[in-house]
Amino acid sequence: MLCGCDEGTIYPDETIDSGRTASVTVTFKGIDAWPKENYLSLAAFGTDTQIPLLTKRISKPTIDGRERTVKLNNLSPDTKSINIAIISNGKKVIYSYCNQPVENNGENIEINFGELELASFKRIQSQVFKTNCLSCHGESSSGLAGNLDLRENTAYKSLVNVKAPVSEEGMNYVTPGDPHNSFILEILEENPIHKDMFNSTGKQEILALIKTWIQEGAPNN
């Protein structure tokens, strides 16, 4: 004798959507600067913009410049904004690219962030210089190491097309479009004082970020 099933739950409760969904359309540019140690994520934030309520890792696309849509399900009623951000394994916000405030009206959310440049100078300033470099290049009472000021309002003009005084080859710190003639990469890769500033994966992420930015013309973006 065959018996049919009643309306009992077939799937685990956690697979059932219980909140709103955010559908985000975005085009990634400069995917060679995709994070390696950290995670590029779609994230929902409440009133605290440093601790996400919910995150979803975004997988790296195979082709630069292709539009894609990413969804974030089960949004909390406390959600105040949807962001695309680089987030550490410990859920720390490393850098936020863009955010969209949202209302708690019960409706699903659709956002188009357009083109997102992964290798931006703002990301370099926030993720690299502000976190690791200012003690010697901006905040030291003994002066600027290498005559290089990496504070936010001066970093770009201190780097781009500026001769590095300690470069034996007379290279610029940054030569737009030419990573091989940009002394900043040599400093981070080979200089004894700087080469151990990051762990292996973190160093790969930083070097790829700066190299991609230089290859794309070193814009002040």
What residue ranges belong to the model's regions?
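Aromatic- and Gly/Pro-enriched helix-to-coil junctions and flexible linker segments
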Residues: 5-22, 26-30, 35-56, 61-66, ...
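Short strand-edge motifs at loop-to-beta-strand transitions and within beta-strands
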Residues: 68-70
